[in-house]
């Protein structure tokens, strides 16, 4: 897994910090799809993950948290700080996603969350299914991760 001066192992405290400071689009998405308050939803995502990371800005401020479950479900939730350093955030996100040792990654995103839809496109995820859940318009996305190390037994 890629680590850098902007990507760190996540802790429950990091998850709560981001949960209390989510972008409004991320907050709406998780509260409407998970039925939990934002901090609780972020903490649940953290505890359900096989791995999780904490992204920071060049100024050390929280940008977001992300993780992957044992079922290959990738997730990311962000603060507004990422909007202040978009190139750094996209570059580091790409490095992290491309370093993951999973055969594929998938999840869904609220179609109204334009920043994350754009980020997913930049990270080369493919959109494969549109549906509505709890009144939320969602898009399923997937990315095959052709990592040769996974083929060795």
Set out the residue ranges of the language-model regions.
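A short helix-loop-beta-strand connector motif used in the catalytic cores of GNAT acetyltransferases and
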Residues: 42-55, 61
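Conserved acyl-CoA
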Residues: 91-105, 123
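A short, internal acetyl-CoA/4′-phosphopantetheine-binding micro-motif in the GNAT/acyltransferase core
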Residues: 75-91
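Conserved beta-strand in the GNAT
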Residues: 54, 58-75
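Conserved beta-strand-loop-alpha-helix junction that forms the acyl-donor binding cleft
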Residues: 105-121, 131-135
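A short beta-loop-alpha structural element at the N-terminal edge
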Residues: 1-22
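Conserved GNAT-fold acetyl-CoA-binding loop/helix
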Residues: 24-42
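C-terminal "cap" of GNAT-fold acetyltransferases
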Residues: 133-153
């Amino acid at each position: 897994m890629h680590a850098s001066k902007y990507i760190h192992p996540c802790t429950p405290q990091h998850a709560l910090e981001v949960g209390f400071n989510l972008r409004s689009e991320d907050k709406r998405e998780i509260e409407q799809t998970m039925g939990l308050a934002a901090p609780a939803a972020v903490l649940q995502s953290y505890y359900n993950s096989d791995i999780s990371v904490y992204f920071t800005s060049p100024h050390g401020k929280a940008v977001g948290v992300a993780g992957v479950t044992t079922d290959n479900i990738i997730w990311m939730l962000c603060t507004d700080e990422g909007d202040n350093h978009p190139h750094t955030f996209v570059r580091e996100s790409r490095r992290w996603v491309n370093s993951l040792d999973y055969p594929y990654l998938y999840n869904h995103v609220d179609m109204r969350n334009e920043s994350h839809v754009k980020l997913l496109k930049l990270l080369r995820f493919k959109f494969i299914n549109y549906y509505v859940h709890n009144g939320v318009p969602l898009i399923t996305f997937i990315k095959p991760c052709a990592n040769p190390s996974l083929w060795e037994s």
